[in-house]
Amino acid sequence: MVPGTGGGRDCLTLVVATALTQLLWLPGCCGSHIVGGHEVKPHARPYMASVNFEGHHHCGGFLFHAHWVLSAAHCFSDRDPSTGLVVLGAHALLTPEPTQQVFGIAAVVSHPDFEPTTQANDICLLRLNGSAVLGPAVRLLRLPRRGAKPPVAGTRCRVSGWGSVSDFEEPPPGLMEVEVRILDLSVCNSSWQGQLSPAMLCTHSGDRRRRGFCSADSGGPLVCGNRAHGLVSFSGLWCGDPKTPDVYTQVSAFVSWIWDVVRASPTPGSMGCSLRAV
């Protein structure tokens, strides 16, 4: 705006816009992306799952059992699971691939103590309406062992996703990934003004560069030592900003609950999968 023009109306607009930019991105919102990462080799992360609504990628997740995907509970806060699909074996979501397996969602089991306002216990299980066919492009990712402690500060981990690769919602060419480091939870909690719970994990870039995730990558795994130690939960306004470190659900805190849910649930039939043709 040119100085001296527009009057009070433009001034008010500027004030409102400035105030809005101070808000956090809500998890699952648009315009989010892996920051400072790179495209992985096709199917190098065969455990990755895309949760899809109305033909569009909505959240991530990962396959830990032939019938089950782990994701973030907030991804389903305002969604009807019966209208969603889970895509396995994908690299480029916008391109038909013979490796892709597509399932309906038979059930969503969110943690009973999930708190949407604080994102505490932000974890859910998706029961597929069929059994994944395991192979080179579709494989399981291991959970932490029961009673395992979270990775120590400084541990190098990786996080993957299909979120957009620019602030203009540009879709990625394929699955993106970035390397991050575990940040001490007490240090992270100070940055978040004491809002975090003990069952969370934080990461940062380890240097001054912006690296990390944004909310369209929600539900995707934080992989440390070939096990899923975190689930993407929330971040600040500026993705990868060290002032507001990326926050994950700490998977090791929920391993017993996860397997209790799996054991208590019926096994679906094996005919729910459709293989995408070229």
From Swiss-Prot:
All residue ranges annotated as the Peptidase S1 domain in the record: 34-263
Record-annotated disulphide pairs: C59-C75, C157-C224, C188-C202, C214-C239
N-terminal signal peptide: 1-31
GO biological process: protein maturation; proteolysis
Glycosylation sites noted in the Swiss-Prot or TrEMBL record: N129
Top-level lineage group: Eukaryota
Top-level enzyme category: hydrolase
Similarity comment: Belongs to the peptidase S1 family.
The protein, known as: Serine protease 57
Source organism of this protein record: Rattus norvegicus
